[in-house]
């Protein structure tokens, strides 16, 4: 592991306006949007209206480029993550902002953290930076055309001095874990000068993100799949097979028909190349996740903070297979020169131990400040509950039952009340060493109920939003029972386990209880997967029909355009604002089109034309997960809890 060789302050004087003007172009945001201003520091000396203002640059350290951070900060007006997400979605015409950022993260080609990362031209140790970039300026009516004399003393050598125009920002790097005193002599109109000083101390918080698909951001690839004309699927039935067409991945040039037998390995690789892109493909980690959005929001609102996020959450994780042991990979990334992947993802606790070992090799005193966590749904086989509700056809239900992919409410209840308490006990024991023995530094963000359209009113069932596969159709009674289980048993049960309510398998409730977040659940009640509004995207209103007849059945017309409405599939806007905050099966296919990897042999599709993968793609690949707006609402609920754990104050605009 290589460390940056910057052992002293390095000065770069850049006018603030010019520095921002050099950022890459970005889609225009609504009028009135502005980057949050730098926060003033309380002066140590001096009088009058002058004070020193400073901020950490590129303070969300997962980003390589400060320009990316500034673009996202510009969408924030202090009114929450959801409001900012709405502005970003409109500014990008519903195509998403993360597609322009995902290639510029401190991650390798497989989505794993790089210990050494080049950020804005400087190689840094991602986990243990020795210094931080900051910008310093003067707030107050400085004389025009005057020059100010700055000095910076970090206590490890001679102070650094520079003379610049008073209206210019001074950019420099200050040592980590050390206070730097900044002073400036400001000329006054009477020929004298006023000295103003302040202390600069960057706080760098180290946060791990753990858990399952809800923690990872499933359903929302950083770059959504691009769509075009029809692609043939062959559905095997008891008496033979049938064919139907759905949108293809744009750019896929191999055979789209079902007439020429199984697809070749070359065709499969070409199919992979044109899939969605994820921050981490094996685990479907996404920049849209509530964990990323929470810590990004904190970095935006706290100018003196640097945020070092370690994202480890993984779709499909259970406490046993995912946290303590490895699990199947959700996807296999296509990387030039690598033709195969292992089909597995490592245990999150193993990864976290490796991360902290790397941290302590460089800085034995640096520890985790906090853990973000969501886990437990897969332990009660929530995906099996989803399959039980939406898979209506006999052939597919039999196959999924044989593969263990169907679960009833009774099955889920037995797991919730039987095995899960002991598993949570093991989870608490494993987490404690990472957070100093007290689990109040673990922020557990709970699940939303995905199947509600209003208070005490579950979605009605049917094929609305589910007709991407002929086998889908939500059974109304099974849906009602599942929604009731989530509302009355699962969510209260998870809360009790996380917080030690009723001493649920907690040896010491004072140290075993986690900080719990569920404020978003009330908001999701009116934004379930069946909710529609006149403000929904035009494609949704015209082409996703409530009667379940969204797709072309004419075998002559479907290869060119599989949509019954006649509009091209490419008009679908994966990240446009919607009334529903839960992805439907249609949304999942049109946004991610996940080809599932690591499945049991009985459930493994024969090739890319096998309609079985369409079932698995919905059940395991994003359906019944929050949209980007839903994850943003979860982040809004989490931010106050995170501030409390880290001992941070809300900015004045939020307090007001």
Task: Indicate where each model-derived feature is located.
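Short, solvent-exposed loop/turn and secondary-structure capping segments
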Residues: 217-226, 321-325, 382-387, 454-457
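Beta-strand-enriched, solvent-exposed domains that form extended recognition/catalytic surfaces
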Residues: 29-206
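Structural recognition of the beta-strand scaffold that forms the well-ordered cores
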Residues: 206-210, 214-218, 308-313, 369-374, ...
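Bacterial N-terminal signal peptides
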Residues: 4-15
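A structural motif corresponding to the C-terminal end of an alpha-helix
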Residues: 290-308, 364, 416-442, 478-520
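Conserved SGNH/GDSL esterase-like catalytic core that processes O-acyl groups on lipids
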Residues: 230-415
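Low-complexity, serine/threonine/proline-enriched polar segments
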Residues: 73-102, 233-301, 375, 404-407, ...
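Mobile gating loops/cap/lid regions near enzyme active sites that modulate substrate access
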Residues: 449-499, 503-624
């Amino acid at each position: 592991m290589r460390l940056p060789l910057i052992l002293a302050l390095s000065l770069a004087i850049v006018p603030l306006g010019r520095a921002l003007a050099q950022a890459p172009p970005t889609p225009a945001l609504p009028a009135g949007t502005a980057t949050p201003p730098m926060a003033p520091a309380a002066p140590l000396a001096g009088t009058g209206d002058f004070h020193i203002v400073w901020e950490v640059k590129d303070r969300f350290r997962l980003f390589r480029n400060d320009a990316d951070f500034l673009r996202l900060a510009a969408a924030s007006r202090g009114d929450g993550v959801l409001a900012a997400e709405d502005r970003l979605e409109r500014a990008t015409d519903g195509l998403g902002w993360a597609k322009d950022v995902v290639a510029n993260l401190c991650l390798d080609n497989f989505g794993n953290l790089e210990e050494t990362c080049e950020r804005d031209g400087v190689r840094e140790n991602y986990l243990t930076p020795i210094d931080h970039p900051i910008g310093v300026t003067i707030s107050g009516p400085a004389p025009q055309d005057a020059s100010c004399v700055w000095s910076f003393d970090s206590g490890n050598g001679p102070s650094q001095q520079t003379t610049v125009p008073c209206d210019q920002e001074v950019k420099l790097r200050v040592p980590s874990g050390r206070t730097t005193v900044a002073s400036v002599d400001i000329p006054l109109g009477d020929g004298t000068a006023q000295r103003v000083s302040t202390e600069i101390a960057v706080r760098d918080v180290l946060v791990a993100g753990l858990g399952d698909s809800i923690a990872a951001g499933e359903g929302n690839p950083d770059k959504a799949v691009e769509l075009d004309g029809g692609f043939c699927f062959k559905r095997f039935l008891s008496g033979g097979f049938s064919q139907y067409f759905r949108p293809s991945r744009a750019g896929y040039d191999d055979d789209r028909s079902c007439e020429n037998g199984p697809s070749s390995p070359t065709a499969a690789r070409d199919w992979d190349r044109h899939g969605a892109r994820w921050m981490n493909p094996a685990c479907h980690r996404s920049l849209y996740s509530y964990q990323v959005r929470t810590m990004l929001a904190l970095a935006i609102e706290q100018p003196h903070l640097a945020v070092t996020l370690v994202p480890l959450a993984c779709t499909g994780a259970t406490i046993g297979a995912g946290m303590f042991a490895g699990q199947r990979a959700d996807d296999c990334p296509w990387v030039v020169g690598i033709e195969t992947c292992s089909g597995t993802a490592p245990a999150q606790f193993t990864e976290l131990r490796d991360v902290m070992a790397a941290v302590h090799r460089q800085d034995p005193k640096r520890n985790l400040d906090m853990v973000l966590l969501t886990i437990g749904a897969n332990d009660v086989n929530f995906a099996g509950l989803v399959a039980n509700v939406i898979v209506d056809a006999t052939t597919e239900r039999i196959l999924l039952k044989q593969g263990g992919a169907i679960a009833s409410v009774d099955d889920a209840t037995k797991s919730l009340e039987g095995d899960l308490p002991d598993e949570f006990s093991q989870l608490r024991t494993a987490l404690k060493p990472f957070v100093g023995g007290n689990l109040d530094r673990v922020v557990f963000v709970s699940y939303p109920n995905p199947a509600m359209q209003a208070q005490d009113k579950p979605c009605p069932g049917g094929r609305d939003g589910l007709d991407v596969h002929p086998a889908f159709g939500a059974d109304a009674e099974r849906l009602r029972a599942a929604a009731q289980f989530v509302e009355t048993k699962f969510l209260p049960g998870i809360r009790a386990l996380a917080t030690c309510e009723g001493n649920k398998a907690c040896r010491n409730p004072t140290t075993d209880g986690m900080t719990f977040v569920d404020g978003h659940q009330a908001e999701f009640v009116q934004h379930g997967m069946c909710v529609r509004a006149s403000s929904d995207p035009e494609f949704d209103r015209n082409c996703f029909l409530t009667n379940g007849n969204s797709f072309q059945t004419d075998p002559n017309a479907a290869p060119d355009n599989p949509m019954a409405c006649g509009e091209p599939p490419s008009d679908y806007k994966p990240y446009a604002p919607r009334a529903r905050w839960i992805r439907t099966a249609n949304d999942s296919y049109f946004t991610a089109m996940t080809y599932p990897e690591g499945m049991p042999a009985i459930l493994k599709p024969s090739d890319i034309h096998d309609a079985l993968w369409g079932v698995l793609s919905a059940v395991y690949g994003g359906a019944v997960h929050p949209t980007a707006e839903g994850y943003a609402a979860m982040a809004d609920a989490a931010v106050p809890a995170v501030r409390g754990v880290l001992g941070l104050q809300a900015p004045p605009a939020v307090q007001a």
